Amino acid sequence: VPCSIEGGQIMANYFSLILVALTLITGLIWLVDSLVFAPKRKARLQAAATAEGAGYGEDPQLPYLVDTSQQIFPVIAFVLVLRSFLYEPFQIPSGSMMPTLLVGDFILVEKFAYGVKDPVFRSKLIETGVPERGDVVVFKYPEEPSIDYIKRVIGLPGDTVVYQNKQVYIKPKCETGNNCPKLKAVPLTFQERGEFVQDMAQLMRYTEDLGTVEHDILRHPVREISPVNFYTQPGTRSNEWIVPEGQYFVLGDNRDNSRDSRFWGFVPDANLVGKAVAIWISFEFERSPSDFLPTWVPTGVRFERAGGIH
């Protein structure tokens, strides 16, 4: 079942607990029956057959609970492993990552990209990698971990990030202490205006070059975000942030319609869920208020959106 991102309370944690509990219960029933009760049933059958002077005959019918457990255990165990350690589906319910991700996109998140974690307590079991600049990541919202957010990694640990006049500036971490990188604007190339409309305004589309990743962003032509509303880090200006070790600075691609690190700070490594790698299907939900069908019923399928996420 796909979980919504940035759309309200998430049932993912409860679903994981239910999956783990069902896997343990059905597996335990199957195991106990195989080791304890199945041999007893066969012994009774053999004794009855010997008394009648016949062979073993047919196996006795399994108890309903055992039969059900044997049938569903492999299925839910497979789902548990797939969802907890490999890939998990999510639904995009908001436009904060437009134009990269649209409302109605269903995406796959690679759960093992930044470490293998246990499905209940989310403690890291195996190190597999760290986010790179430009990755689109799903994470637990630091201010309310029951909610999953999706944003793009802009600042890595040790980086200095400045956001001024809708422009992102980055000074990468100085690794050696000599010839340290300087603060530079992230290159932007204007693409078009008018494909997306918000608040009656035609949004401007740019291509942003983060060095290893090129991706498109949207800007509102009029709306300005005051630094007064930004998260203030002690010792820095209101529009400047120094990314702490083990944390990340993230932004939405729809820059003037996204609540991200500018407003609430950094994403700890422990909050990372995984890397968004693909759109597997995309639905349109464009119903008028007078339509008799509920709003969650799709009005169309955007097959052309299926593919990798960049």
Residue ranges and their predicted role:
Residues 51-87:
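Internal/C-terminal transmembrane anchor helices
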